[in-house]
């Protein structure tokens, strides 16, 4: 499936009393380099009409503590490979929190704890009715849970450790067998951990190294793609350098 490459959005936000944040954005897509108006055949994925994103959060703080809890989500519809006809729809609901604690007795080091839960409900009417079908049935859901703890040593170095989990409906048509990206049993289940360290030698320079490890990937820990690949074959190291002028 070709991924959406061009999208425009218009949004706004408001903060009340330094505690309550409310924001929202409307998006729509239009693919360039194709016939206009867009007939949908240039790309495998289009936003049908308008996609809505929202965010509501509440934060409070004291001398050495800061706490935030919120919710966010998005709703959109798509007609795969077209601009009319049957639609697939997606609705994401999410909740998140973050707690930061400054530790004065340790030179104001900061401990941060973060967590996120996302529920994606999808109604794949168009995909299930396609010829050939790209989904085995209409109603699907995905659950994503992620939590992490980060420790800041002063304002130069920080380390992070986190866990993540993805579960949902098994559908061999939606998640077919294929080398590397494929799926032996049609399950989207993935689980793993993230470890990272960041260093800022100067205020405008940031260096980060992150390691992601998988215990399960696409429903399995061994031979998950029916081509002999194990979940830990997707373990990866990510390096980033940031310079601000």
Please annotate each region the language model reported.
Residues 1-57, 230, 235, 242:
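Surface-exposed coil loops of outer-membrane beta-barrel proteins
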Residues 1-5, 117-132, 170-172, 213-224, ...:
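Outer-membrane beta-barrel translocator/channel fold
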Residues 5, 49-51, 90-92, 142, ...:
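Membrane-spanning beta-strands of outer-membrane beta-barrel proteins
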Residues 11-13, 55-57, 96-98, 148-150, ...:
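Outer-membrane beta-barrel architecture
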Residues 32-88:
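Loop-centered beta-sheet repeat module
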Residues 66-195, 199:
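Detector for outer-membrane/organellar transmembrane beta-barrel domains
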Residues 197-211, 216-218:
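C-terminal closing repeat unit and adjoining cap/tail of repeat-based domains
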Residues 199, 205, 231-245:
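Outer-membrane beta-barrel "beta-signal"
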């Amino acid at each position: 499936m070709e991924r959406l490459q061009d999208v425009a959005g218009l949004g706004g936000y408001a903060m009340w009393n330094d505690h309550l944040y409310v924001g929202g954005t409307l998006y729509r897509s239009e693919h360039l380099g194709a016939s206009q108006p867009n007939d949908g055949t240039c790309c495998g994925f289009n936003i049908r009409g308008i996609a809505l994103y929202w965010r509501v959060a509440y934060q409070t703080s004291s001398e050495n503590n800061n706490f935030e809890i919120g919710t966010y989500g998005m709703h959109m519809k798509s007609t795969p490979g077209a601009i009319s006809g049957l639609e697939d729809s997606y609705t994401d609901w999410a909740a998140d929190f973050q707690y930061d604690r400054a530790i004065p007795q340790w030179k104001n080091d900061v401990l941060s704890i973060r967590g996120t839960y996302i529920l994606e409900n999808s109604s794949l009417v168009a995909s299930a009715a396609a010829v050939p079908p790209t989904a085995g049935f209409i109603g699907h859901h995905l659950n994503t849970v992620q939590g992490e703890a980060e420790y800041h040593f002063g304002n130069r170095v920080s380390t992070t450790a986190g866990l993540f989990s993805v579960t949902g409906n098994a559908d061999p048509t939606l998640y077919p067998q294929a080398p590397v990206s494929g799926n032996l049993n049609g399950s989207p289940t993935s689980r793993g951990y993230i470890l990272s360290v960041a260093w800022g030698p100067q205020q405008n320079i940031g260096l980060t190294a992150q390691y992601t490890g998988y215990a399960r990937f696409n429903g399995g820990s061994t031979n998950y793609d029916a081509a002999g690949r194990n979940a830990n074959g997707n373990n990866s190291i990510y390096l980033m350098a940031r310079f601000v002028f």
